[in-house]
């Protein structure tokens, strides 16, 4: 095989992996929007009391607690099509069934109907959170180091596309054809990802398969400490905990800050709800593209600096003003830098995982990161 043929084969392999990762991002983002925005809109339109709608976040607890059953995916892999895609396929089929079943329910003040909706939302969250574990593990095991930045960008693009499709598109369908059509379209979107899961690149067999639940539960932490060393373990955990901490603080205070600057709800909604999403996607693509050239260490430093610059754009907005144009500039800079930081952060988490324990280790590292987002 000549050099050009080898390069072409490598490019095709890269493209195939990125398409697979992006498709799994779609499959991951769609159920989350169904269980939050779509469900809230449906219950509100059906006249369900706000006090009951406020309980929806309780059904989303599986997303927070998923690290407790992540070891099960490492211990008992489903061998077909491979150890990660087996779980992906199972969860996607279950998600299609649950979302489609929700379209048949009629939420009202009837306790039996509300109970059915609540149980469906809980099952949806459990299946979706389990799929997220498998998606993270598959992406981690599949992508070589040089492609992890681009893979993070591809996953984010798929995820955002699903959120827009189910969030905005679902409400448009509900307005025109009714809420069952919105849920059925979301189920169809997840179902459309099943062929991508079946045709995605197959993972290489892992050496030294896990043979006990004890090993699946205790092994990930032991292996991580052994591989990194005690001192470096704490350094890495602090990096995971603090690297995106400024983003979390800014996100929590952005809306109150902009209100204090005198911007209207319409201005904030238009810029934060629309423009910011596009800027984040652009930043993720830029970050993923630069990662392959810069590598992990330089990307971590340079993207962190870009994050500081992005955050300072809000200081400049408060100091110098600028009206709506200044708002758009500040939000654009902050979200572009946030997208870049997010791309390298996902690549960092993937690089810290061992393929034997990637489901559990990624879930644990994500849990450490989640602590920085807690109030």
Q: Model regions: which residues?
A:
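C-terminal ends and interior cores of transmembrane alpha-helices
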Residues: 88-111, 305-322
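Symmetry-related core transmembrane helices of the 12-TM Major Facilitator Superfamily/SLC fold
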Residues: 90-96, 181-199
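Helix-to-loop junctions at the C-terminal end of transmembrane segments
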Residues: 65-82, 282-299
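Glycine-rich segments within core transmembrane alpha-helices of 12-TM secondary carriers
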Residues: 63-66, 149-170, 174, 366-375
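C-terminal transmembrane helical hairpin of 12-TM major facilitator-type secondary transporters
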Residues: 298-348
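Helix-loop boundary and gating motifs at the non-cytosolic
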Residues: 7-63, 234-239, 243-257, 261, ...
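Intracellular juxtamembrane helix-capping segments at the cytosolic ends
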Residues: 129-143, 340-354, 360, 366
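Juxtamembrane intracellular "pre-TM" segments in multi-pass secondary transporters
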Residues: 2-14, 202-236
């Amino acid at each position: 095989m000549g050099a050009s043929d080898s390069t072409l084969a490598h490019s095709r392999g890269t493209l195939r992996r990125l398409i697979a990762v992006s498709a799994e991002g779609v499959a991951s983002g769609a159920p989350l929007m169904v269980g939050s925005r779509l469900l809230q809109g449906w219950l509100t339109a059906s006249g369900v009391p706000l006090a009951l709608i406020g309980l929806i976040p309780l059904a989303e607890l599986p997303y927070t607690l998923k690290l407790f059953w992540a070891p099960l995916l490492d211990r008992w892999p489903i061998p077909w099509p491979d150890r990660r895609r087996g779980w992906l396929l199972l969860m996607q089929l279950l998600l299609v069934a649950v979302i489609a079943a929700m379209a048949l329910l009629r939420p009202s003040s009837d306790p039996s109907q509300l109970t059915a909706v609540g149980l469906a939302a809980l099952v949806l969250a459990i299946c979706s959170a389990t799929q997220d574990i498998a998606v993270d593990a598959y992406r981690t095991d599949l992508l070589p180091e040089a492609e992890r930045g681009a893979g993070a960008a591809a996953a984010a693009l798929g995820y955002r596309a699903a959120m827009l499709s189910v969030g905005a598109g679902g409400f448009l369908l509900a307005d025109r054809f009714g809420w069952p059509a919105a849920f059925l379209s979301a189920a169809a979107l997840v179902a459309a990802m099943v062929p991508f899961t079946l045709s995605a690149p197959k993972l290489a067999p892992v050496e030294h398969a896990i043979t006990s639940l004890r090993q699946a539960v205790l092994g990930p932490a032991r292996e991580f400490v052994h591989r990194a060393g005690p001192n470096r373990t704490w350094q890495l955990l602090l990096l995971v905990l603090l690297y995106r901490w400024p983003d979390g603080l800014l996100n929590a205070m952005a809306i109150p800050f902009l209100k204090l600057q005198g911007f209207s709800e319409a201005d904030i909604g238009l810029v934060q709800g629309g423009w910011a999403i596009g800027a984040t996607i652009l930043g993720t693509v830029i970050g993923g593209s630069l990662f392959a050239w810069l590598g992990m260490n330089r990307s971590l430093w340079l993207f962190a600096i870009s994050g500081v610059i992005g955050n300072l754009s809000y200081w400049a907005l408060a100091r110098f003003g600028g009206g709506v144009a200044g708002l758009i500039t500040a939000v654009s800079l902050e979200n572009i830098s946030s997208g870049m930081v997010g791309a390298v952060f996902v690549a960092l988490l993937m690089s810290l995982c061992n393929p034997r324990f990637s489901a559990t280790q990624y879930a644990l590292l994500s849990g450490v990161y989640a602590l920085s987002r807690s109030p």
